[in-house]
């Protein structure tokens, strides 16, 4: 038994060491990273925090935002999720902040690859490929922690789905229910919603395989188990989901009482304004950042004066101007950094397109292309308009460029499949 799980234990220990090493020495010196969104959230919750300290009761209303709004939209807290919160701490091995984030990112993708039957050493490499793409550390620096944690729980959720379709119904159902519950508790529904498309692609691949092998009853049985598991995971967070749903009707995500007509119409029948949805759209040419990180300059927060290549040809007379200009020159209003998966990983992905066989390869290819094109947003409006108008809930979310997290997931996954074939 010990011999069988020893490679997995070694991988987990390696992930802990890697996570500590990445944040060294800050993780042992008690340094605190300034994160804009985290600081803004702390400010918004200060009134509710002071009320709790004075009375010992949690208020469900604050005047700190938008002239007054429910606190459960700022920092949801429900007694029903307390067991989940403790389970989450155990899963994170009670590691310190930031170290725990990197650890669960590594571990989640490792679990997924092991569900596919990938050897432990190769699954460990896959976890590193996934975790150390640029986007996740940009999320940490910006303070988008809920989004980060939600994304960390998505690979093990899909691992449960894979196990179920591979015939391990009990293990697959438990894993799916558990990580769906953690995922929704992390409170970034947009990321969970986007990965429903990935799940559809993967389920489609297993359906095709079942059709070819005449094992459709087994496929539908696994699908039924997964549906029950999903309902259990959702039910564990029903309080938060219900309150979010009811409150959303009174916000800009609900149906507008004022309707524009004619060419000026930008408002969807219900949901966000089209311009607001697509304001952060990845440029078509900007897609090259998957291969070349600074193809569009890099970060908006980095001044042009810090670019050695640009300064070699710059006129020194305009030095103060260069300090105020960003390095980024893409189509988004601003960005903290590019979506970069790594040249080596992308090479393996392309290799996988040729040497990996079976419907799962086409599912991953389709999901990759799908996410890239949808991330273009206002730069490819025919498809974007179709999704806004006809795909349920798509118009509830803004910053369509963030759907590129799908490509960040599928590219290293197919890359590891390619390495297994080599």
PLM-predicted stretches and their roles:
Residues 108-115, 121-209, 222-244:
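Membrane-embedded helix bundles of polyisoprenyl
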Residues 1-24, 221-230, 350:
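Start-transfer (signal-anchor) and selected internal transmembrane alpha helices
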Residues 221-282:
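Polar, glycine-rich mid-to-C-terminal structural blocks
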């Amino acid at each position: 038994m010990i011999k069988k799980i020893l490679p997995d234990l070694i991988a987990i220990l390696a992930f802990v060491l890697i996570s500590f090493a990445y944040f060294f020495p800050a993780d042992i010196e008690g340094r605190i990273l300034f994160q804009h969104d985290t600081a803004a959230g702390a400010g918004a919750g200060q009134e509710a925090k002071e009320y709790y300290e004075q009375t010992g009761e949690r208020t469900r209303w604050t005047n700190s935002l938008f002239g007054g709004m429910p606190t459960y939209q700022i920092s949801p807290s429900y007694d029903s999720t307390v067991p989940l919160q403790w389970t989450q701490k155990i899963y994170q091995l009670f590691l310190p902040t930031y170290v725990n984030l990197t650890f669960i990112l590594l571990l989640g993708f490792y679990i997924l690859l092991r569900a596919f039957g990938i050897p432990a050493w190769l699954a460990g490499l896959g976890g590193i490929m996934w975790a150390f793409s640029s986007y996740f550390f940009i999320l940490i620096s910006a303070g988008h922690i809920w989004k980060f944690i939600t994304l960390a729980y998505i690979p093990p959720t899909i691992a449960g789905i894979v196990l179920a379709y591979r015939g391990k119904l009990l293990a697959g159902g438990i894993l799916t229910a558990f990580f769906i519950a953690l995922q929704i508790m992390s409170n970034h529904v947009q990321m969970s919603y986007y990965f429903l498309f990935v799940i559809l692609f993967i389920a489609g691949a297993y359906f095709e395989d079942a059709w070819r092998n005449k094992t459709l009853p087994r496929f539908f049985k696994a699908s039924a188990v997964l549906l029950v598991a999903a309902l259990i995971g959702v039910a564990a967070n029903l309080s938060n989901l219900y309150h979010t749903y009811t409150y959303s009707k009174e916000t800009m995500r609900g149906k507008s009482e004022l309707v524009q007509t004619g060419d000026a119409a930008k408002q969807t029948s219900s949901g966000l304004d089209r311009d607001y949805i697509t304001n952060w759209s990845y440029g078509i040419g900007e897609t090259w950042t998957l291969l070349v990180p600074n193809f569009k300059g890099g970060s908006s927060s980095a001044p042009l004066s810090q670019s050695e290549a640009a300064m070699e040809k710059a006129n020194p007379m305009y030095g103060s101007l260069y300090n105020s200009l960003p390095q980024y020159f893409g189509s988004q209003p601003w960005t903290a950094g590019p979506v970069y998966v790594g040249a080596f990983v992308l090479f393996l992905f392309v290799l996988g397109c040729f040497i990996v066989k079976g419907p799962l390869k086409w599912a991953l290819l389709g999901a990759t292309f799908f996410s890239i094109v949808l991330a273009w947003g206002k730069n490819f409006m025919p498809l974007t308009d179709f999704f806004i108008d006809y795909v349920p809930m798509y118009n509830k979310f803004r910053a369509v460029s963030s759907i590129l997290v799908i490509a960040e997931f599928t590219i290293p996954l197919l890359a590891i499949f390619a390495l297994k074939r080599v």
